[in-house]
Structure formats: structure tokens, C-alpha cells
């Protein structure tokens, strides 16, 4: 049963608060959820959900707006889990749209946080990379969990992260709070481009069978390949995702991919020239 909730735009407005650039928006939350659901290990809400609300859970009294905000995030988690399990071809990330341009950066930042929460379990997916090579951005909490700078940071730490190419830039970066309505529809095809080098590359040697995209048209491939690719007896085989990447660095990476039937599936793709 769906919990009482608010719309995604309402959630984004509440999270925006006073408009500071370090707020976490719905698109970043959706990236976090995607990594949590698609990851090789179970990560309980008690671990990942506080990252959405600045490191601690709000006082969600029954019937309160805080309860509905939490419910909205949990409902999206359940929806993504259901889609990636039962209908991965129908999963679409929640990206932001600004003046007709699809902005993927905040989603990738959230996805990168999800990677860091998975820790050692992501090492097999990273090919020959050691688990220590995967990004663990931010500070360590008392419980040993990484507190992601984009989700819960003071002003000094945000500025420190922003000035270093080895950390993920604050998700707003003068643009996050100016974005328009949230969309979950596949965006129109655009030409991907790269502005800075990428610090993280996950090599995956599996992709979807051709029939999963037989309906045609532009699409954003589901990140479920990261999860289902670990199962030896499933229907994911054959092709490959070349570079599945959570974008690190500055400025925001803006791109979409269009998948033709039978083509390699690519999500947040950066290529080395």
C-alpha cells in the first residue's frame, strides 16, 4: 500500500529550504535510491535515509508534513525496487530539466553516494579495481558510514570539497536551485559531452537482451544491469555497458543517451579521448 505522500515537486521545494546551494534535491535522492536498490547488498533505510535529511531523521509524527516527506522517498524506493525486479525496461531516472536541457549531474551525485554506502560489495563490479579504489567521498561518521558532502555538510567542508577535483562538487553548483519541473520521462536525444576528467569508472561486461527495448524510441537504460549482471542464470548477457559512471568533478555533467534496439546500453557515459 502506498504511504501518504507529497508530489516530487513539493518534496523538492521543502528540501530546498532557504535556497542554499548545498540542499539535496529529488533527482539526487533518486540516484541514491537507484544505487541502493541495484546494489549487490541490502542497505537498510536506517542507513541510507538519514543522508537525505542532513544526517538524521526528521521527527515524523503521524499525519505531519515530515512524515509525508519521508513517505515520498520511501514510496519512490519501493517503486524503483518493483520496476528493477519486474519491469526494468520501464524504469526511468528522475532527472532535472532546465531551459529544455536535461541535467543528469545531481542524479549521478546521488548514485555515487549509493556506491559509497555499498563499500566492499561493489568491488567485483568494478572489475580489476580494488574496493579501496571506489570513491568514499565525505567524512566518516561515528558509526563508520560515509557522510556525503553533497548531502550533509557545513559551509567550510562544502567549500573544501568544491575546491578539490578529487571530491564530488556540491549538487547545486549555482544551478541546482534554478532548475525547472522534475520529469521522469525519457528526455529527447542530446549530444553528450565531457568537461573534466572522471575519477570513477565501473566496467560492466553485461547488458540487456535486444527484446527489452523492442518498443523503440529514446530511452534511458535502467541501472538494474548492475544488480542483475551479478546473477549467472538471468537473461542479462551478451552486449556490454561500456562505461557506467557516476560523475565526479566540476562542473555538472549534462548528458542523455538514446538506445536503439540491439545497441550497447550506456548510462552517464564519459569516454577517454
Curated annotation (Swiss-Prot):
Signal peptide feature range: none
Bias-annotated ranges (Low complexity): 183-192
Localization of this protein: Cell membrane
Stretches for region Disordered: 132-194
SUPFAM superfamilies in the record: YgfB-like
Predominant localisation class: membrane
GO (cellular component) term, any one: plasma membrane
Topology class, membrane: Multi-pass membrane protein
Keywords: Cell membrane, Membrane, Plasmid, Transmembrane, Transmembrane helix
InterPro entries: YgfB-like (IPR011978), YgfB-like_sf (IPR036255)
Top-level taxon of the source organism: Bacteria
Compositionally biased residues, Basic residues: 164-179
Spans through the membrane: 24-44, 103-123
Name of the protein in its database record: Uncharacterized protein y4jE
Organism: Sinorhizobium fredii (strain NBRC 101917 / NGR234)
